């Protein structure tokens, strides 16, 4: 009987946790007093915003914590090539910031520490020359 009860608890918890949360679109977010909120929430937004181009290719992936950008943000061109990656911590650029041309060639790479440019700043032309 104890094994059966454990099985049902496991089954129920699996069903509950496997239900996907409704995706939040970037356009459903708004700014208030410097923080980001979802249109249906009273508290600042915590979570991920993932969107695709109509073709199904990734368009963007943003993470928010306490209404501020957090972790790595990524954008892609509609051809699937990466467009931009930015690392945030508590709403401030902290780490690498990279951008690409639509042809896939890297455009620039910069490093930030606490929102301030720190270190080497490298830029490339669309043909790959620096």
Question: Language-model segments: which ranges?
Answer:
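Sec-dependent N-terminal signal peptides
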Residues: 4-14
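Glycine/tyrosine- and acidic-biased, solvent-exposed loop/turn segments at the edges of beta-strands
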Residues: 14-130
């Amino acid at each position: 009987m104890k094994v059966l009860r454990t099985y049902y608890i496991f089954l129920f918890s699996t069903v509950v946790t496997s239900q996907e949360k409704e995706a939040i679109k970037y356009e459903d977010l708004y700014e208030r007093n410097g923080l980001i909120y979802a249109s249906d929430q009273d508290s600042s937004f915590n979570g991920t915003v993932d969107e695709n181009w109509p073709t199904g290719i990734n368009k963007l992936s943003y993470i928010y914590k306490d209404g501020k950008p957090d972790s790595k943000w990524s954008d892609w061109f509609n051809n699937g090539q990466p467009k931009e990656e930015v690392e945030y911590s508590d709403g401030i650029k902290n780490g690498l910031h990279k951008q690409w041309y639509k042809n896939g060639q890297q455009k620039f790479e910069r490093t930030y520490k606490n929102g301030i440019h720190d270190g080497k700043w490298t830029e490339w032309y669309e043909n790959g020359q620096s």
